[in-house]
Amino acid sequence: MSQAEFPITPEVEADLRIARRGCDELLVESEFARKLARSRATGVPLRIKLGLDPTAPDIHLGHTVVLNKMRQLQDLGHTVIFLIGDFTSTIGDPSGRNSTRPPLTREQIEHNAKTYYAQASLVLDPARTEIRYNSEWCDPLGARGMIQLASRYTVARMMEREDFTRRFKTGVPIAVHEFLYPLMQGYDSVALKADLELGGTDQKFNLLVGRELQKEYGQEPQCILTMPLLVGTDGVDKMSKSKGNYIGISESPDSMFGKLMSISDTLMWRYFELLSFRSLEDIAALKAEIDAGRNPRDAKVALAQEIITRFHSAKDAEQALANFEARFRDGAIPDDIPEVNLAGAPMGILHVLRASSLCASSSEAQRAIEQGGVKIDGAKIEDRSLQLNAGSYVLQVGKRKFARVNLAV
């Protein structure tokens, strides 16, 4: 029976909905549906690949978006391949860069890979995850094999990539070795005989190279699934340590809880879609309750507890909630406090205190901070240069002055 003849059953359609949830693109969807149908009919799991270059040892919630998708597909019974690009890391991925990315040393790669996988295992099921290193097949290629591989793809096709085109037009140098990165990543799919490859939206070109190379090597081409980049806690830029708008998965439960409670109500629903394992039906029902008048805080608490349970424990999640509520209770925050809407995030704390009428001047705000009299969401602050990203905050000055500040861009 050919792949096209396997029936698209209701179970296959349900699997396809899970794959599509929150994704940016699924190419080619009709092909992937047939792959799912074949897998259902034959009992042979699909080989689903996620390649990661361990360029940094720690990961945040933004990195887990694609890991969550891998876990969802893993739970459908498919084989998940967690590919560590120890070879390609020595080249340096130019994706989205305006300059050459420096390669890593073998020692850096080994350290980062161990730390990265240990954290990724909090999302993936280690018992059902195949770990591979692309040096297994890339190192033996040698010069002859590398040249033969390069002959499979043209410079014209390579220049279709936006960042290469931009750098070429603006006179920013492109090193020849940078062309090798997407080729080597594509060759990984050939070596692994991948049925589906996942990646961020910035990896689309590289994933398509893998699809084309599989055709060159006589294999059934993989489908590709790209996931969006998670917006950070500021509600503006993608989650990034450099932007200060990130939530690290190794942060303390209290820190994670506070940051998740600070995001805007609108952003909360995007986090539910990309970070929660709740069904879309459950999320829709919760949203309907909020729209009908239930406090959005209840939904944020549910989201925060789910995420903290995943990366710590249910007990830690309950304790983080208790600690969060205790900070407010001990601070004797009134039920009805003035609400202030401000625009211009990120905004300095001195400006926020002045604009919300909690302090008459910047000097008064500075003194209040130095004397330990300023709290944000129940936590005392000491940094007078603190910048607040977009979000909702409860500010307290002294024992009796409060304001709920909704800070927008």
UniProtKB/Swiss-Prot annotation:
Q: Which UniProt keywords apply?
A: Aminoacyl-tRNA synthetase, ATP-binding, Cytoplasm, Ligase, Nucleotide-binding, Protein biosynthesis, RNA-binding
Q: Which GO terms describe its biological process?
A: tyrosyl-tRNA aminoacylation
Q: Which PROSITE patterns match?
A: AA_TRNA_LIGASE_I, S4
**Main site of residence?**
cytoplasm
Q: Residues that bind ATP, according to the entry?
A: 241
Motif residue range(s): 'HIGH' region: 54-63
Task: Indicate whether RNA-binding appears among the record's keywords.
Answer: yes
Q: Which Gene3D superfamilies match?
A: HUPs (3.40.50.620), RNA-binding S4 domain (3.10.290.10), Tyrosyl-Transfer RNA Synthetase (1.10.240.10)
Q: Which reaction does it catalyse?
A: tRNA(Tyr) + L-tyrosine + ATP = L-tyrosyl-tRNA(Tyr) + AMP + diphosphate + H(+)
Residue stretches making up the S4 RNA-binding domain: 347-407
Description of how the protein assembles with itself and partners? Homodimer.
Report the function annotation for this chain.
Answer: Catalyzes the attachment of tyrosine to tRNA(Tyr) in a two-step reaction: tyrosine is first activated by ATP to form Tyr-AMP and then transferred to the acceptor end of tRNA(Tyr).
**What is this protein's record name?**
Tyrosine--tRNA ligase
Query: Mind giving the lineage of the organism this protein is from?
Result: Bacteria, Pseudomonadati, Pseudomonadota, Betaproteobacteria, Burkholderiales
Gene name? tyrS
